[in-house]
Amino acid sequence: MNLNKTAIVTLLSLATLIGFGGSAIAQNAMGTHMNGDGTDMSHSQGKYSGKNSMANLTTEQQAIRQQVLNEFQASTADMRQQLTSKNYEYKALLTSKPVDEQKVLAVSKEIQTLRDSLYQRRVSMDTQLAKAGIAMTGNHGSRGGNHMGMAGGRGCR
């Protein structure tokens, strides 16, 4: 009788674990950085702009757009790396004991300066594309747009 109780409890525990585990995996398939169609949004311009974002552009416009985007990525690579480093430094300062409010404030100002510079470069890129007759694709203000407003950004800081 004791063996039967142990076997039943073990089987029920295993079934529960498998049931809840499968449910957790199924719900976690689409994280906050994923589009509804399961594609990664980290380099896209919005939810509906994936592979077909340049479908309405001529071959010349596609080449110009790609060149401008490549130039933007190359020209802002160091700035984006600095921004990442400053964000890590900011988080480290907030978790240090005691918290040095002056250092935190100074780093936050550096972060804001980098963000402003990056945004100005983005505006220049958008202007360059507009002058070439290439409309912006995607959603630049929310959920995955490169301007990262609303839920696509990292929240308030």
From Swiss-Prot:
It comes from the Bacteria. The keyword Zinc applies. InterPro entries: Metal_resist. One of its GO terms (cellular component) is periplasmic space. Residues 141-157 have a biased composition (Gly residues). Keywords: Periplasm, Signal, Stress response, Zinc. Residues 136-157 are annotated as: Disordered. Residues 1-26 form the signal peptide. It is found in: Periplasm. Part of the Zra signaling pathway, an envelope stress response (ESR) system composed of the periplasmic accessory protein ZraP, the histidine kinase ZraS and the transcriptional regulator ZraR. The ZraPSR system contributes to antibiotic resistance and is important for membrane integrity in the presence of membrane-targeting biocides. ZraP acts as a modulator which has both a regulatory and a chaperone function. The zinc-bound form of ZraP modulates the response of the ZraPSR system by inhibiting the expression of the zra genes, probably by interacting with ZraS. Belongs to the ZraP family. This is Signaling pathway modulator ZraP.
